C-alpha cells in the first residue's frame, strides 16, 4: 500500500518476493546476539534509477540502525529521501485502542466523503516490480565446517569478509561486503555448506 501511494501505481502483492521468519533459527538469534544485532522482519521498497525494488524478508540490523528498537506490538517506518534524509515513523500496530482509532478514522472518512471515497493517490496503471535481491547489499551467512578449514575458500569467493564464530559449534558465519543476491549465491556455491543467508544492514 505504501509503495502504491508513493509511486501512484497499482502494486500486485503476489509479485513481491516474500520470506517469513519460519526459517530463522535459534542459532541465527545466537549469532545476532553475539554481534550485538537483531533480526527483524522488514518490508523493503526502494526507488533506484526509476525502478522499484520490493521485498518482505528478515534483515539483520545492529543497534545503530533506527528500526533496531522496534519491538512487541509496535511498528516502524523508515523513509529515506534524497532531500529529506532519514525520517522515522513509530507507533502501535496492534491492540484495542490503535485498532479502534483506525476504525473510527475510516468511519469519519465514510461520513465525510459519502459515495465519493477519498482519493488516496494511485491509478490503475500496474507497477513493474523488481526483486530487492537485485540490489547490492551485505549478507550474513552461516556455513558448515570450521573457519580454519574454509577461510581460503571464503576469501577466494567473497573477498574481504568479517568472520563470526560461536564456541563449540560445527559451523561459522561471515558478514560479506555489498553484493547482489545472484553474486552471493554464486560465491556461496563455491564455498559449499551454506546453512543460512540473511540480508544485513550493519
Label each region the model flagged.
Residues 107-202:
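A conserved regulatory-domain signal marking ACT and ACT-like small-molecule sensing domains
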Residues 1-69, 74-76:
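Substrate-binding/catalytic subdomain of NAD(P)-dependent oxidoreductase enzymes
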Residues 11-14, 35-40, 49-57, 75, ...:
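Generic structural motif recognizing short loop/turn segments at the entrances and edges of beta-strands
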Residues 29-39, 86-94, 98, 158-168:
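Short secondary-structure transition/capping segments
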Residues 53-144:
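Catalytic, metal-anchored helix/loop core of enzyme active sites in primary metabolism
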Residues 21-22, 52, 95, 164-168, ...:
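Conserved N-terminal alpha-helical segment that immediately precedes and caps sugar-phosphate-binding
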Residues 21-25, 96, 100, 147:
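Generic structural signal for well-ordered, non-membrane alpha-helical segments
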Residues 7-11, 17-23, 103, 164, ...:
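Short, exposed beta-strand "edge-strand" segments with a Pro/Gly-rich flavor and a Y/T-containing core
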Amino acid at each position: 500500500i505504501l509503495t502504491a501511494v508513493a509511486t501512484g501505481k497499482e502494486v500486485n502483492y503476489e509479485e513481491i518476493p516474500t520470506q517469513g521468519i519460519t526459517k530463522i533459527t535459534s542459532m541465527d538469534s545466537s549469532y545476532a546476539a553475539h554481534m550485538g544485532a537483531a533480526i527483524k522482519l522488514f518490508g523493503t521498497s526502494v526507488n533506484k534509477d526509476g525502478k522499484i525494488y520490493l521485498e518482505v524478508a528478515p534483515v539483520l540490523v545492529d543497534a545503530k540502525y533506527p528500526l533496531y528498537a522496534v519491538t512487541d506490538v509496535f511498528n516502524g517506518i523508515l523513509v529515506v529521501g534524497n532531500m529529506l534524509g532519514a525520517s522515522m515513523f513509530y507507533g502501535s500496530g496492534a491492540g484495542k485502542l490503535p485498532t479502534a482509532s483506525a476504525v473510527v478514522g475510516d468511519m469519519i472518512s465514510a461520513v465525510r466523503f459519502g459515495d465519493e471515497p477519498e482519493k488516496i493517490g494511485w491509478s490503475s496503471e500496474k507497477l513493474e516490480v523488481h526483486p530487492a535481491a537485485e540490489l547490492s547489499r551485505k549478507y550474513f551467512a552461516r556455513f558448515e565446517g570450521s573457519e580454519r578449514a574454509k577461510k581460503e575458500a571464503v576469501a577466494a569467493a567473497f573477498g574481504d569478509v568479517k568472520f563470526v564464530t560461536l564456541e563449540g559449534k560445527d559451523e561459522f558465519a561471515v558478514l560479506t561486503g555489498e553484493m547482489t543476491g545472484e553474486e552471493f549465491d554464486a560465491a556461496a556455491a563455491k564455498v559449499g555448506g551454506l546453512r543460512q543467508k540473511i540480508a544485513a544492514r550493519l
